[in-house]
Amino acid sequence: MRKARVERKTKESHVLVELNLDGSGAIDVDTGVPFFDHMLSQLGKHSGFDLTVKTSGDIDVDSHHTVEDTSLAFGQALREALGEKVGIRRFGDAMVPLDEVLVQAAVDLSGRPYLVHRQPEIVELIGTFDTTLGRHIWESIVAEARIALHVRVLEGRNAHHVFEAQFKAVARALRDAVTLDGVAGVPSTKGVL
């Protein structure tokens, strides 16, 4: 089974992430940051991964450490669950609309962290969530998962929709990339990812 359990403890947060790439989209998320919970739930549901996230952090200061550490732990769990990446498709992409928003995401499970993220500048709160953390979420996931990720917001105005469509698009791209396609070995001429 392609599963991982990651626990991350710092002076700022305590994070537990359990991930099953071959799940059914079962989700149990509680970070103490409701909008971030909603986004992680989109990631679990639309990827088809089983995802459990439990975070306690210094949200009395703000949500930055909680969001960052949770994103790092998710990225690590994704990397560990993928293991040697034998038989996966490796590449995935998705185009996701959400009302007036259109987002494109593409992923390469390459072992090399790289992020291209294009979104209109959004500086506001969604509930208690600081939208300036958006890019940092993807940076943190990419760094620990060691993947190349491109996310482009092609159209959109509503901040909630812009964020939600990104998480759905990345989820669908990941779903494709982690799929076992029956081809023997690692999908690289190097023989390793």
Where are these regions (language model features)?
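Structural preference for solvent-exposed beta-strand-turn elements
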Residues: 1-193
